[in-house]
Amino acid sequence: MNYFDLFNVVPAFDIDTALLAERYRELQRAVHPDKFANDTEQQKLLSVQRTAQVNDGYQTLKNPLRRAEHMLSLRGIELSHETTTLKDGAFLMQQMEWREALEDIQHNSDPQSSIDELYESFGEFESTLLTKLATLLISDESADALLAADQIRKLKFMAKLHDELARIEDGLLD
């Protein structure tokens, strides 16, 4: 299903999230199961299914990473359940450096400073990835779609690093 069509928004990486939220509320009102309480069982079931589609579509389009994955899936590139590993040597080296830095945080004399530095480093790297991703998703070239897939894989890894850093930070506050 093309969620951009469902929400009547232009397929793009950068979307108007306020417009998306407005369309979501409109669709929810139109397909809400309560509106079909006195209808046939089939109508009730269709309403529940449609509500689930609207909810999934909204969650997909409001999240930049999921939105990018959806854009690629519309082009036949599925990333949601893949196990492909990245072959970018520089990125793999950077991953190792970040992992070492995460492990060293608890041994630092000023762990919060290290945490702040890592958040800043992650943010700068992610910003670069997102800029590249937005450019690649505009292109109709299949090679660019494959490069966009690699950017998404990197961003997924960065999300895991963020989660790990947040867990470490929470552990220090306990």
From Swiss-Prot:
It comes from Shewanella frigidimarina (strain NCIMB 400). The lineage of its organism: Bacteria, Pseudomonadati, Pseudomonadota, Gammaproteobacteria, Alteromonadales. CDD domains: DnaJ (cd06257). One of its GO terms (cellular component) is iron-sulfur cluster transfer complex. Keywords: Chaperone. GO terms for molecular function: ATPase activator activity; protein-folding chaperone binding. This is Co-chaperone protein HscB homolog. Transmembrane segments: none annotated. NCBIfam families: hscB (TIGR00714), PRK05014.1 (NF003449). GO terms for biological process: [2Fe-2S] cluster assembly; protein complex oligomerization; protein folding. Gene3D superfamilies: DnaJ domain, HscB, C-terminal domain. Disulfide bonds: none annotated. Co-chaperone involved in the maturation of iron-sulfur cluster-containing proteins. Seems to help targeting proteins to be folded toward HscA. It comes from the Bacteria. Interacts with HscA and stimulates its ATPase activity. Belongs to the HscB family. SMART domains: DnaJ. The keyword Chaperone applies. HAMAP family: HscB. SUPFAM superfamilies: Chaperone J-domain, HSC20 (HSCB), C-terminal oligomerisation domain.
